[in-house]
């Protein structure tokens, strides 16, 4: 049996949405964990090796923006995608500014979801590899910093 591609944490207080996302990700070969709020999500991240997080904005106990901020602070480099029906430009700007790499508004197509998730995870892996390799000189370090800013803002 082939091992899962990635372990993805799906955070949403709506059971149906969690079920649909997990079912789709499982068909793509990913392993999934779920959480119903930000507090539960941080606990799952602490206890498991998570490759990516997909979260809603509106969550009980700890909202998605606070969750993203905490992930960025405690687990830098862990990619986060927001998927929400909460349609305000403020939410997208805020989520990206606190550390989300992708912002997907519901409803969305499965193809769009998969493409953006794969891009986000691949970008995070490239950045991680680049950071783990010792830069040959300061120019390369500056280039890496610029690439990180570009990836964060794309």
List PLM regions with ranges:
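Active-site T/S-Asp motif of two-component receiver
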Residues: 55-56
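Two-component/phosphorelay signaling modules centered on CheY-like receiver
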Residues: 15-33
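Alpha4 helix (beta4-alpha4-beta5 surface) of REC/receiver domains from two-component response regulators
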Residues: 66, 87-102, 115
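A Lys-centered signature of the CheY-like receiver
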Residues: 106
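Acidic catalytic/metal-coordinating carboxylates
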Residues: 37-40, 63-66
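Receiver (REC) domain active-site loop signature in two-component systems and cognate sites
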Residues: 59
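CheY-like receiver
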Residues: 122-154
């Amino acid at each position: 049996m082939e091992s899962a591609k990635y372990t993805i944490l799906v955070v949403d207080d709506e059971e149906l949405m969690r079920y649909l996302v997990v079912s789709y990700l499982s068909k793509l070969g990913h392993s999934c964990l779920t959480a119903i709020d930000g507090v539960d999500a941080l606990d799952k991240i602490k206890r498991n090796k998570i490759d990516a997080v997909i979260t809603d904005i509106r969550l009980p106990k700890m909202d998605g923006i606070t969750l993203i901020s905490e992930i960025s602070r405690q687990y830098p480099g862990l990619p986060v995608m927001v998927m929400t029906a909460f349609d305000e430009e403020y939410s997208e700007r805020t989520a990206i500014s606190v550390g989300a790499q992708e912002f997907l508004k519901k409803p969305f197509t499965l193809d769009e979801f998969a493409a953006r998730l794969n891009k986000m995870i691949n970008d995070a892996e490239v950045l991680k590899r680049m950071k783990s390799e010792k830069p040959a000189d300061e120019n390369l370090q500056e280039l890496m910093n610029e690439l990180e800013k570009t990836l964060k803002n794309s």
